[in-house]
Amino acid sequence: MVDVLNIESLDLEARGIAHRDGKVLFVEGALPGERVTVQTVRRKPSYEIAKVEEVLRPSSQRVAPRCPHFGVCGGCAMQHLAPAAQVAIKQRALEDTFWHVGKLKPARILPPLYGPTWGYRYRARLSVRVVPKKGGVLVGFHERKSSYVADMRECHVLPPAVSRLLLPLRAMIAAMSAPDRMPQIEVALGDETIVLVLRHLLPLTDGDIAVLRAFAAEHGVQWWLQSKGPDTVHPLEREHADALAYTLPEFGLRMPYRPTDFTQVNHAINRAMVSRALKLLDVQPQDRVADLFCGLGNFTLPLATQGREAVGVEGSKALTDRAHEAAARHGLGERTRFATLNLFEVDVQWLRGLGYFDRMLIDPPREGAQAVAQALSLLAPGERPRRIVYVSCSPGTLARDAAIMVHEGGYALRSAGVINMFPHTGHVESIAVFESLDEATVLQAQAQARQKAREEAERLAEAAAA
């Protein structure tokens, strides 16, 4: 059955949203404001999934996708939407999530943080499959919502130097002894180096090693090998162990890392994000600053150039060891401290044990920082960091943690905005600023919140009685 629909909005999977007969329809390929004919492909009791058959009235924000694989490859979802409109949708999603999850509205919306929209992806995980029906070996991202590997010949979100490797990598894998036992190639680009990590399930032969070395010499890359878990990753050539690094030129820092270490996908946006975070924190020379979920010290080392002391805490000892080494190499050893701890299990006693911090930066993974937020909420007004900057890759967990800090912890949500870390995808990276309130203001806000809750309960009771 073909229906005609008016598209009202867009979700973060880049599906148009419409309503019909009390049901929500998610429409693949449609944009807000468009009038389209659709074919339903899946029916559920409360919603349907449909795909566009014809765009009768296109959106002014619709653009031609640059990539010939768009729509099949799962690497991108929004190439058909103008970049500024993509960011606007993410900003609206962030604000909506703050309200629906945390009943919060930022006092100020920060301008979006933009960077390159093409060739930005300096980290990628490429799947490898032997598919005789498609000519042999495929190397690329998965097809959208599928375990199949897309038949990719180029990729515009990868740097051109990596995109050009997709077809040569196919030929190289095909020449190996067991191409069907090499399921993955991870890509990590430093400012000067391309590293490829080959996952192999069987031992490599001397012939395989020769093929890898010939490929490296021809294409100017470095190979690392992984036979089992992450701890088995090692460079093919020993002298390449410390070649991978990114820079933070504003702070005069070079940050070495291993291809298995967490680093931001988008180097240009990372530099801009670090700069903005430090400006928002407004660190003074006498300040003591905490950097929680510090990783390699991406924020800790820049913070140490501005404050009296920067303390980085992270769950991975390998990362804190490398952060400590980088700090020493840059002459920041006396102004930094690093600790290894599971930040998902901390409490207020632990937080008090670290001593007082004037400022705090929190940059957790998608799981957020709920335990940290709860610990902060139990501090007395004089114990709290005066300002906190929270960098997030999940609006849902950010809103959850923000609600704890604001409704229970005596903080105000001063500002928030999106960081366009992943153009053409639905991933929302964001940054938020919290400021500690004085005790009188906190008590007043809590009393107002209790009064509103009572009024809402009374309204619901009256409605039920009627």
Swiss-Prot record:
Stored HAMAP family: 23SrRNA_methyltr_RlmD
List of residues binding [4Fe-4S] cluster: 67, 73, 76, 155
Catalysed reactions, semicolon-separated: uridine(1939) in 23S rRNA + S-adenosyl-L-methionine = 5-methyluridine(1939) in 23S rRNA + S-adenosyl-L-homocysteine + H(+)
Protein name: 23S rRNA (uracil(1939)-C(5))-methyltransferase RlmD
InterPro entries according to UniProt: 23S_rRNA_MeTrfase_RlmD, MeTrfase_TrmA_AS, MeTrfase_TrmA_CS, NA-bd_OB-fold, SAM-dependent_MTases_sf, TRAM_dom, U5_MeTrfase_fam
Keyword Transferase: yes
Organism of origin: Bordetella pertussis (strain Tohama I / ATCC BAA-589 / NCTC 13251)
Pfam families reported in the protein's UniProt record: TRAM, tRNA_U5-meth_tr
Catalytic residues identified in the record: 393
Family of this protein: Belongs to the class I-like SAM-binding methyltransferase superfamily. RNA M5U methyltransferase family. RlmD subfamily.
Stretches assigned to the TRAM domain: 1-54
Residues involved in S-adenosyl-L-methionine binding: 264, 293, 298, 314, 342, 363
Function: Catalyzes the formation of 5-methyl-uridine at position 1939 (m5U1939) in 23S rRNA.
